[in-house]
Amino acid sequence: MGKTEGQAEEFRARLDKRLDELKWLYSELYHNDENAFQYFLSMLYRMYETRPEPMKQLDREREANPDWCKSNEVLGVMLYTNCFGGTLRGVREHLSYLKESGATYIHLMPLLASPKGRSDGGYAVADFRTVEPELGTMEDFAALAAECHKNGMSVCLDFALNHTSEDHEWARRAKAGEKEFQDRYFFFDNWNIPNDFDRTVPQVFPTTAPGNFSWCDAVQKVVMTTFYPYQWDLNYANPTVFNDMTENLFFLCNQGADIIRLDAVPYIWKALGTTCRNLPQVHTLVRIMRMAVEIVCPVTQLLGEVVMEPSKVVPYFGTLEKPECNVLYNVTTMATTWHTVATRDVRLMKHQLGQIFALPKQYSFLNYLRCHDDIGWGLDYGFLKQFGIDEVGHKHFLNDFFRGYFYGSDARGELYNDDPRIGDARLCGTTASLCGIEAAEYEGNQWKLDRAIRLDIMLHAFLFTLSGVPVIYSGDEIGQRNDYSYHEDPYKWDDSRYLHRGNFSWEDAEKRKDPTTREGRIFTALRELETIRATHEVFRAEADTWIMETYNDHILGIGRYYNGEKLVALFNFDVQDGTAWINEPEEYRNLLNGDRCRATAYGLPAFGFVWLYWSKEEEIEAAKQAESAREAAEKQAEKERKAAARKKAAEEKKAAKQVAEEAAAKAATEEAAAKAEAEEAAAKQAAEEAAARAAAEEAARKTVEAIMKTERAAKKSGTGAKTKRTAKKKGSKK
C-alpha cells in the first residue's frame, strides 16, 4: 500500500467510526442538505490530505493518549504576542524563558488580522488565514509552533467563530450588495425584527456597545452585532458558514495549533424569542466540530469559552458517549476565588467546588486566576441568599473592595462596563495588583508586601491543587502590576481591560533569580509548586477529589486520592492566623518542607497554605523503616544487654578478685601482725632472757668484784694468805 493509499485508509477508518452520527446531526440541522454535507466531507478529506506529516505523526501519537492535555505535567501560559515578544519571531526568541517558567502549553492571544482601532483586542477578525502584519506572517506562526513542539510545548490559538470583522471579505461583499454573502450574516430591512430580538436578548456591552444590532449605511439595512458594531454575527443556520468556518479552523490546526479556543461559542445560534445563548443547535454544532476534529487532526483539543453560570457551562462537555468540548474555562471558580478573597469566607467556594468534584473525571476544566478578560461576578447568588447576601449589593461590595475603596483592602483594580441601570459592573486588574502588591510597594510597606505576596502564592497553590489544566496569565509569574498607560492611548482608553494587558516587563523578569525581590519570591515559589504538581500522581485528573471539613469558615480544605497517594490541601483566606480541624489519623509529609506530622489540627498563618502528602508506598516504606529501626533497636538492646552482662560479669569478677585480694591482703596483714606479734614476743622473751643473763652476769660481776674487793681488802689488812685459803675453801664448797 502506497503512502497516499495508507493515508486515505487512515482517514476512512476515522470517518467510518463517526459517519452515521455525523450525517444524522448535519442533516437534522441543515434540513437534509446533501450537497452541503458532501462538500463538508470533501473539505474534511482535503484538510486531512494537506496536513503536514509532522502534525499527522503527532496525531497518531496522541490518538493513543487522547487525554494528553489533562496530564498533571501540563502547565499553560497565556500571552499577547505583541506584549510578550513584539512579534511571533520575538516570542520564538523567548521560548527559553517560557520553558524555564515550566510552560508546556502556550496560548497566543488573538493574532489574526484585524483592523486597528476596531479589533476588540483581536477578536474582530478580518482574515482567518492571515496574521496581523505587525506580528509577523503565518509562516512565522508555523515556525514558532514547530519550535514549540520540539520543546515539548503545545500551542493554543483563539478562533472567534461567532462573528467576523466588518472588514472581512464576506462582510465587504455583503456591503457591496452580494446576497450570497449577506446571507452569511443577519441582515434586516428595518428595525421590526431586531426590536423583537432585543426583547429577549441581553446586551453584552451595555455601556461601551449598547444594543445587539447596528445600522449599515452601505446597504441601508440593520445587521446583528451582538458584541461591537464592527463585529457582525455569522448566520450558522447557513451550512456554507459552518463549512467554511470549520475549514478555517482546520487551516489553523494545520499550521501547528494543538488547541483551539472556541471564542463566544454559546452565542453562535440565533432564534427569535430566545436569549440567543446556549441553544440546542449550538451543542449540535460543537458535537459535529468535535467529530470533524477527531477525523482530520486528532491531536487538536477544543477549548470552550463559556462565560456563563455553572449550570450553563457543564453541558458544553457533552456526554461521555458524545463529547463536545475537550476542555472548558472554569470561569465560575475564578470568580468565586476572588469573592473568597474579599469576604474571607470559604462557604461559597466549598459549595461550588463540591458541584465540580461531583462531575465525571473525564470533564476537564481550564483553571485560572486572571486572563485577558474582565472578572464578571457570575456567582451562585441562590446559595448566597441564605446568608442574607443581595446580588446587586454584593457586586457593589466586590467592586469596591477590589478598587481599594473598602476598609482594609489594598487591592487595586478598575471597573469595566459599569451599567448603573442595573447596578452591574465587571472588574479589571492583574493578580498582583488585586492581591495588594501594587499598593504595598507604592506605600513602601514591607509587612503589607509580604502579606500580599503570600496571598498571591497561596492563590496559585489553590489553582495547582485543582484537577484540570492550570494556566497562568503572562506576567503573573513575576507579580507584574497594573499598566495604567492605556489611559493615554486613544485606541485603548475606553477599554479598561488594557489595565492588565500591558507589555511584559523584561526588566522585572531579570529579577526573578534574586530571592529577595518580589519577582524572585513569586517566580521561585510557583516553579516549586509546579514541579511538585508534575511529579506527584495524586495531582492527576483521574484522582478522587472532595471537600474536607475544616470547621473553620476561613480555611478551605481539599482532599485528593489516587492510586495509593493522598493529599490534604489547606488554604487560609483570612488575614488572621487560623486552625483547620481535620482529624486525619495518618502521618503526612509536608510537600513544601519535608516535615512530618499528624494532621489532626493544623495551624496556618494569614494567607498561608499547606500540601500534606501521604502515600501507601511511603507508609509501607515508613513501616519497613520502623521495623528496621525496631530490629536495629532490638539488636542494639541485645548488644547492650550482652555488653552489660559482660560488664557485670567483669565487674563481679573484678569485685571477687578485689574481695579475694582484700581477704588475702587481710590475711597477709593478720599473718604479718601475728608474725610481728610473735616476733615481738620472741624479741621480748629474748630481751627478757638477755636481761636475765645480763642481770646474772651483772650479779656475777658484782660478786666477783665483791670478792676481789674483799681480797684486796684482806691483803691490805695483812691477812692475805689466810684470806685466800678461806676464799678457796668457800669457792670449793660452793
Where are these regions (language model features)?
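Active-site and adjacent substrate-binding regions of carbohydrate-active enzymes
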Residues: 1-643, 648, 722-725
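Long, low-complexity, compositionally biased polyampholytic IDRs enriched for Lys/Glu and Gln/Arg
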Residues: 623-715
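Arg/Lys-rich, intrinsically disordered low-complexity tails that mediate electrostatic binding
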Residues: 712-732
